[in-house]
Regions:
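Conserved Rossmann-fold NAD(P)-dependent oxidoreductase catalytic core, especially the SDR/UDP-sugar
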Residues: 77-99, 116
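Conserved beta-loop-beta element that borders a ligand/cofactor-binding pocket
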Residues: 113-122, 166
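A glycine-biased structural micro-motif
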Residues: 21, 48, 74, 111-114
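Short beta-strand and adjoining strand-loop segment in the mid-core
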Residues: 90-98, 127-145
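NAD(P)+-binding Rossmann beta1-loop-alpha1 motif at the extreme N-terminus of oxidoreductases
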Residues: 1-29, 156
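Rossmann-like NAD(P)-binding element
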Residues: 30-76, 83-89
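Active-site-lining helix/loop region of Rossmann-like oxidoreductase modules
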Residues: 135-202
Length: 202
């Protein structure tokens, strides 16, 4: 929604094109006064995009991209999933086989340029198009091109600032922090995001 709101053409993917169309129609109903270039397709159709964002539940991310490995070869793929589990009233981070969801995604599509990003942006804030999302987005990747492309997309969204968090080995810590933020959201009855200070030039 946010990327479509700033002029990018977005294609929603799902295992079935019909399901993707249902989601698309529901999103457009939320903002009837806006012209949003949002299409719908099955996962193979969505994988034809220049940049692919994987927004599945964490345990479905790697299998989903693995089935599309040929289509994703050479493309920037952005992983935004967090491996979390609920224990009682708390969310706790899980450690995927390769240390992070993003690393699992990269292993599933070795020819793709995987970046991890958008982990700490509240979903409701992303969908509230009438105001900016004031936050920093930590981006990490083993591919400079993926970091650059992802950071450029983030810069297009009002209020967001992309920060290069290094190689993909940082993704585990970045993803795990989400559990802390969710717990604080419950405690303070709010929707927290991340903003870092002390950067050069501030």
């Amino acid at each position: 929604m946010r990327l479509a709101a700033v002029g990018h053409e977005v294609v929603l993917g799902s295992r079935s094109a019909e399901r993707a169309e249902e989601v698309r129609a529901g999103l457009l109903e939320l903002w009837p006064g806006r012209e949003l270039a949002i299409g719908a397709a099955d996962n193979a159709g969505a994988a034809a995009a220049d940049v692919v964002v994987v927004a599945t539940p964490w345990d479905g991310a790697a299998p989903t991209v693995a089935a599309l490995a040929e289509a994703l070869d050479g493309k920037v793929v952005i992983s935004m999933a967090n491996a979390l589990t609920r224990v009682g009233k708390e969310f706790q981070p899980l450690i995927p086989p390769r240390g992070s969801v993003a690393a699992d995604v990269q292993a599933a599509v070795p020819g793709a340029l995987v970046a991890a990003a958008f982990h700490h942006v509240p979903a409701k804030e992303l969908g509230a198009l009438d105001h900016p999302v004031e936050c920093d987005v930590l981006v990490c990747s083993d591919h400079p091109t993926a970091t650059e492309v992802t950071s450029a997309l983030i810069a297009d969204i009002p209020g967001m600032r992309a920060l290069d968090a290094g190689r993909l080995t940082a993704a585990g810590a970045i993803e795990s922090l989400t559990a802390v933020l969710i717990g604080m959201n419950v405690r303070y009855r709010t929707r927290l995001s991340v903003r870092l200070t002390g950067l050069p030039g501030e």
